[in-house]
Amino acid sequence: HKEYRRQRQMCIRDRLGVSDTAFASQGLAVHSPIDGGLIATVRETSPAEADAVITQAHAAFMEWRTVPAPRRGEFVRLLGEELRLHKETLGKLVTLEAGKILSEGLGEVQEMIDICDYAVGLSRQLFGLTIATERPNHRMMETWHPLGVCGVISAFNFPVAVWSWNAALALVCGNSVVWKPSEKTPLTALATLAIAERAAKRFGGIPKGLLSVLMGTHSIGAKLVENENVPLVSATGSTAMGRQVAPKLAARFARAILELGGNNAAIIAPSADTALALRAVAFAAIGTAGQRCTTLRRLIVHESLYEPFLTQLRKVYQSVRIGDPRLSDVLVGPLIDAQALTQMDKALAAARALGATITGGGRVTCEGLNGAYAAPALVEMPRQDGPALTETFAPILYVMRYHSLDEAIALQNGVGAGLSSSLFTLDMREAERFLAVDGSDCGIANINIGPSGAEIGGAFGGEKETGGGREAGSDAWKAYMRRATNTINYGTSLPLAQGVSFDLPTD
């Protein structure tokens, strides 16, 4: 086992450039969910070191903000190039550390590349506005300036992509970035920063501390939340985590981008292309072993289609291969750890107590792999209640019938989270109704595509207990900048707005 671990560490060091100083005999023990084996032990950041890192990041910001935005974009372009060069190696590490199937591990790195490409173009489009003014010989405009140190707290399920969504935009906007990754996936974070160092060398150097990482548990993440030199924190995690983070940021008037829980639904209407819907439902419900924030967790099927559609879906659930995510024919890998498997068991027991009929859902033994493997569960509920109302981070799909579209939309909106949603229909009126003000209440509403698989061109995030944050998309850059309104008087008089008169007495 020691030799196996040594070889893995050598791969991370030699192929991705992670320094030996990142590892330690005592610290964060990193286990692969694939086989439960210890990959490495990572040195933790002390509270004092965390404070010093943030101080250094603030100094880096003070320098970086004066670099022209297109030049900042050039660094991000080089970062994207380095990610392309190391896509396969980093993608395999995502699979090893997070348990995703290999195509999803590679796809996550592609997301990083995509957001870098997007941010490069954005670096020449940080537009302000010139605004009509009522005062003669005046000009009024809005300008945008870098904000400061941007903190990023990410979760295990997208161990590198979430950082890139924030970092690529924050960098072109003139900010520094301090990253606190999940304690379950620190190696991918270290590898990402090592790749960024390669880009920095090609760029000609960047300010020390412009990109940095904090290793540890929630107490180290709290340093980002509490530090006055961090004006923005993007936090991805559970709604419970958001309830802890948001008040602390609000208390010091810091900005928050909260990407929290999702209890996403899809509606299958009578006119749906059922072959397309079946594939979309399967991908959204069982991909990443149900551990996406956009995982499909509730399926609302019209009563006329319920039996034939569920018959086909049961066959899919019974045939999908579960096992080592590094194998090309495996579609469902492990849950992140045994605790996740326990939570899945509890949710299924609660559904069964309500009278649900369950297909799948049992624990799966994979030869030679000591991971937390489970069969995806198809749970036919008598009503939307109990565990169907909350998010369980596991491959559980609760299925319900509906009679009218109004009823289906009410079911879809009848939960605390409001991240992603979808409707499968060929009826234009139904589609437009779903997207209208009285349709889906989610931040993402799709037609004939599931709730998962967002692209960086669209704003990502949700409403209600999902937190209200947005990342990527057309105007996400504004979150990483501060806006100033400027009025210039180039005349010789001082006209006041709104016709106010304030004439000083004359001698």
Language-model features, listed with the residues they occupy:
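Glycine-rich loop-to-alpha-helix module at the N-terminal edge of alpha/beta enzyme cores
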Residues: 39-127, 137
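ALDH superfamily catalytic-core signature
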Residues: 198, 240-383, 405, 410, ...
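Conserved C-terminal structural/oligomerization subdomain of aldehyde/semialdehyde dehydrogenase
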Residues: 35-41, 205, 230, 267, ...
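Single conserved hydrophobic/aromatic residue that forms the stacking wall/gate
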Residues: 1-8
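Rossmann-like NAD(P) dinucleotide-binding subdomain of oxidoreductase/dehydrogenase enzymes
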Residues: 128-276, 402
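Short, basic/aromatic recognition patches
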Residues: 9-23
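Active-site and channel-lining beta-strand-loop segments
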Residues: 20-45, 463
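Residue-level signal for inorganic ion chemistry
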Residues: 36, 72, 94, 116, ...
